[in-house]
Amino acid sequence: MQIKNSKIIVIKLGSSTVVDNKGKFKKKWVNSLIKDIKEYNKEKKIVIVTSGAIALGQKYLKIKKKRIKLEMSQAVAAIGQIHLVSEFQKLFEKFKIKTGQILISPDDTEQRKRALNIRSTFNNLFTLKAIP
């Protein structure tokens, strides 16, 4: 399916796409992406799925990139998530694009009531002209 025929475009950004090898957020690259998103967002619904919270958390906490236990990686991600969202928010604001955040766990997709609630949240964000 081509983008022009799609109603919703989901953009998946991996850690190495948004965070450089030194653990810094790639502002210039993301800024360029947002320019493109602004154009598509006129006619399409856009969803951004991004990684990078652990990498930014490691940078902020000055933790060297190495294997860390799950419990610690979740804490590092919790800290990094704040920085990740902040960076995205600043860049989207420059383009006057509203954004929202939806945090989803596997349980949310496996239980019908929760899945319907998530769908409703997405639809309401689209109604508000915000990019989740």
Question: At which residue positions do the language-model features occur?
Answer:
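Nucleotide/pyrophosphate-binding catalytic subdomain
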Residues: 1-131
